[in-house]
């Protein structure tokens, strides 16, 4: 089962939830899809690290064969190509590596070269296999890295926890495509409702079963909880505003490995999520 954990912004508690769920599961895989700022490995401190380069294909033209017909330039809808002063110019950052220019070039003047955009790091931490995507500084998009992460995860026959990027943009969409269930993490504020609504709309578009974890809850009014009740959204768990839990997390510690009360909290959450996911799967068959 693949469980994606997402939130409308950073700092909501997405990594807190995904790291502790992966740690409390008997045998699991934690995948950090937040390739711009991966931090899950800082908690797990995995051993026996392995690294794999992630590359994309970029076009290059043979000046001896290129006639300047501009077929490739006209084809590219991303404006990644320009023909200037008798030379084909490739804008690497805009290219989506679709390969269309290579296919449509009538002179067969275009070939492809590899360009590294990041890496995938994997290792072991106790009962958890920890996999992190890491995008090189200055890159425009981490989607190819996430695609590679998810491609590799299809081989896993374990519970897989996907720590998604914050927000609801392209990288988040790519992260949840293969998810069996989505956990939306929200804060108990009016601003938290706005962020929750963004990812709520996203999972509905992707027709993914989902539930909400309310983090940093106080005894006061909870606008995020009100939003869930109004929209008949399943509340999976309410995590209280807890100085001890926050301090552990800020110090890079995994709460379920440090204190039995947090182990019980996240174990109950895992049981609830598993039950909800099985129920949704049964409803679809």
What are these regions (language model features)?
Residues 202-285:
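C-terminal lobe/tail of nucleotide-utilizing enzymes
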Residues 71-89, 100-115:
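Iron-sulfur cluster-binding cysteine motifs and their immediate structural context
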Residues 1-25:
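Walker A (P-loop) phosphate-binding motif
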Residues 4, 28, 182-183:
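Short, well-ordered beta-strand core segments
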Residues 169-190, 196:
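Inter-motif core of Ras-like GTPase G domains
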Residues 8, 21-24, 45-68, 79-97, ...:
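Ferredoxin-like iron-sulfur electron-transfer modules
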């Amino acid at each position: 089962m693949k469980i994606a954990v997402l939130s409308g912004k950073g700092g909501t508690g997405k990594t807190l939830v995904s790291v502790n769920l992966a740690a409390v599961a008997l045998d699991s895989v934690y995948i950090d899809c937040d390739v711009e700022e991966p931090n899950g490995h800082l908690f797990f401190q995995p051993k026996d690290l392995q690294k794999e380069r992630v590359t994309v294909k970029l076009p290059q033209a043979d000046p001896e064969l290129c006639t300047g017909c501009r077929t490739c330039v006209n084809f590219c809808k991303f404006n990644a190509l320009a023909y200037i002063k008798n030379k084909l110019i490739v804008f690497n950052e805009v290219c989506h590596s679709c390969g269309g220019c290579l296919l449509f070039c009538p002179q067969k003047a275009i070939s492809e070269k590899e360009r590294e955009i990041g890496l995938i790091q994997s290792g072991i931490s106790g009962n958890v296999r920890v996999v992190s995507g890491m995008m090189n500084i200055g890159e425009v998009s981490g989607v190819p890295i996430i695609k590679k992460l998810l491609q590799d995860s299809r081989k896993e026959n374990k519970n897989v926890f996907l720590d998604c990027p914050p927000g609801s943009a392209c990288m988040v969409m790519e992260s949840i495509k293969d998810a069996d269930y989505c956990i939306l993490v929200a804060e108990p504020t009016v601003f938290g409702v706005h962020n929750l609504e963004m990812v709520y709309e996203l999972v509905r578009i992707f027709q993914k079963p989902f539930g909400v974890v309310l983090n940093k809850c106080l005894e006061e009014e909870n606008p995020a909880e009100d939003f869930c009740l109004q929209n008949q959204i399943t509340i999976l768990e309410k995590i209280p505003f807890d100085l001890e839990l926050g301090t552990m997390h800020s110090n890079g510690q995994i709460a379920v490995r440090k204190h039995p009360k947090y182990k019980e909290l996240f174990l109950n959450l895992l049981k609830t999520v598993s039950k909800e996911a099985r129920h949704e799967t049964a409803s679809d068959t």
